[in-house]
Regions:
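Alpha-helical solenoid repeat scaffolds
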Residues: 1-178
Length: 178
């Protein structure tokens, strides 16, 4: 079913058929949600369609060309917040290639945050400068601290890893992903 969802297109299959196909089973992928959303919009249910596109955008597994295609196709439905949610999803899943492609479309503050997270994930050069460039409002971001902790642990810096663990808040609101 997952592979079948990636073959669907409203240009090849009527929106009504796509909606009927998904009525038996919910979409498995973000890609499937976006195609179902587009079908709902073409069938007149704009609110449901936009919600599905926004939801699917966050987790869709897109190649470089598909990212460009869907950005252009859905630009009137997607806003900066949707791009931020997608970047967050990609960063938490350590999908650094897709994150790198998305970074340039983020607002400047978030671009700096996710650039730092990307460099930490890939063990790239300029970690200290990238972290220094992160705006103060994101210095204590759960994802950034997670990536810093992982980076330090892999570099054998156990003392400074412990320092991060002890300074972060230990509550449900802060710990986005347990």
């Amino acid at each position: 079913r997952y592979l079948a969802e990636h073959k669907l297109s409203t240009e090849k299959v009527s929106p009504r058929k796509i909606i009927n196909w998904f009525s038996k089973n919910e979409p498995l992928s973000g890609y499937g949600k976006m195609i179902l959303g587009e079908s709902h919009i073409l069938s007149g249910d704009k609110a449901k369609g936009i919600a599905l596109i926004k939801n699917g955008w966050i987790s869709a597994d897109l190649s470089k060309s598909e990212l460009r295609f869907f950005r252009k196709k859905y630009k009137k439905y997607l806003d900066a917040n949707d791009y931020i949610k997608r970047a967050d999803h990609l960063a938490w899943n350590s999908d650094h290639w897709d994150l790198k492609r998305l970074i340039r479309y983020l607002p400047k503050d978030y671009e700096l945050l996710y650039t730092a997270r990307h460099i930490l994930m890939t063990k790239g050069y300029g970690v200290d400068q990238a972290i220094k460039n992160v705006p103060n409002k994101f210095k204590n971001d759960a994802g950034l601290n997670y990536d810093r902790l992982k980076w330090r642990r892999k570099k054998g810096r156990l003392e400074s890893s412990t320092e991060i663990l002890l300074k972060i808040r230990n509550d449900k609101d802060y710990l986005v992903r347990p």
